[in-house]
Amino acid sequence: VKWTDKERAVILGIFSGLDYEDIGPKALVRCLIVYPWTQRYFGTFGNLSTPAAISGNPKIAAHGVKVLHGLDMALQHMDNIMETYADLSILHSETLHVDPDNFKLLADCLTITIAAKMGHCFTPDTQIAFHKFLAVVVSALGKQYC
């Protein structure tokens, strides 16, 4: 993947202003509520029976933060995201058996959550760069499934 200087600046700018403790949980909670079938991967996380239970679940919140911090690896290795995520791809495919389509769903929920937080600053140009970044990450996470 080729990144323009503008794309790099936009992506790094988005993450430099993020409150991981806020955005990570909100994105994962949104995914689990909007796409309830994704809850099956979180059976050990306790009560996920209602949107309120999911929103108030500390294990879900902690995992949302972990997922968002997982994107830091991609930020640090933007020119080699596929190789950077090779081990995570194996983990999610061979050990956790996560349906790779769920990565796209979470990416969409993360985009919505960040757009809501950034408001008018989340311009179409910002979305283009962010979407490209997440598409590369989603592809890297799903690589092992091919």
Swiss-Prot record:
Domain (Globin) ranges: 2-146
InterPro entries: Globin, Globin-like_sf, Globin/Proto, Hemoglobin_b, Hemoglobin_oxygen_transport
SUPFAM superfamilies: Globin-like
Tissue-level expression: Red blood cells.
Pfam families noted in UniProt: Globin
GO (cellular component) term, any one: blood microparticle
Iron in keyword set: yes
GO terms, biological process: hydrogen peroxide catabolic process; oxygen transport
Binding site for heme b: H63, H92
Protein's job: Involved in oxygen transport from gills to the various peripheral tissues.
Other remarks on this protein: This fish has just a single hemoglobin. It displays a weak Bohr effect that is not effector-enhanced and shows a propensity to form disulfide-linked polymers in vitro.
Family stated for the protein in its record: Belongs to the globin family.
Protein's UniProt name: Hemoglobin subunit beta-1
Organism this protein belongs to: Lycodes reticulatus
Originating gene: hbb1
